[in-house]
């Protein structure tokens, strides 16, 4: 079975969602199904159908999260000792050589990625170009508009 890298923060978010689904959402939908059943004829009961659909979604999401946590390789970026190299979990400050713009990204797992928050997927083109490089190195990234060159200004593990 393959392992999926995930940061400690990402694993905690999954655990929180799983707890909420099991302790709040699941009991609420079970009550909604019971109330809809009490109304009688189920063949034309929209509330019952909606509650059953919601139950299916919740159970599916619970299974999905449990599966991901089972396969997860949880990595705490603050405990990584990569000697200044860019690795999974690292926070990297870059400077676009063409524009001089500075940008900061943290390399995270697939489910954690959110570009607006500066969290990039470990399998994204920019992350793949950065992995293994060090402060002062230049990474070339194939972008839709052509090759972009980024100088690595700083690497942190937090």
Positions of PLM-derived features:
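Non-DNA-binding regulatory cores of transcription-related proteins
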Residues: 75-158
């Amino acid at each position: 079975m393959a392992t999926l890298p995930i940061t400690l923060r990402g694993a905690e978010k999954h655990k929180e969602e799983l707890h909420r689904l099991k302790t709040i959402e699941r009991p609420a939908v079970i009550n909604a199904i019971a109330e809809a059943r009490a109304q009688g004829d189920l063949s034309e009961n929209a509330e019952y159908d909606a509650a059953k659909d919601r139950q299916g979604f919740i159970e599916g999401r619970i299974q999905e999260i449990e599966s991901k946590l089972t396969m997860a390789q949880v990595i705490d970026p603050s405990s990584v000792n990569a000697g200044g190299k860019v690795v999974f979990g690292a926070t990297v400050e870059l400077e676009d050589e063409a524009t001089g713009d500075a940008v900061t990204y943290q390399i995270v797992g697939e489910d954690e990625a959110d570009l607006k928050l500066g969290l990039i997927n470990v399998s994204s083109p920019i992350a793949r170009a950065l992995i293994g490089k060090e402060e002062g190195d230049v990474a070339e990234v194939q972008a839709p508009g052509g090759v972009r060159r980024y100088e690595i200004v700083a690497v942190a593990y937090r």
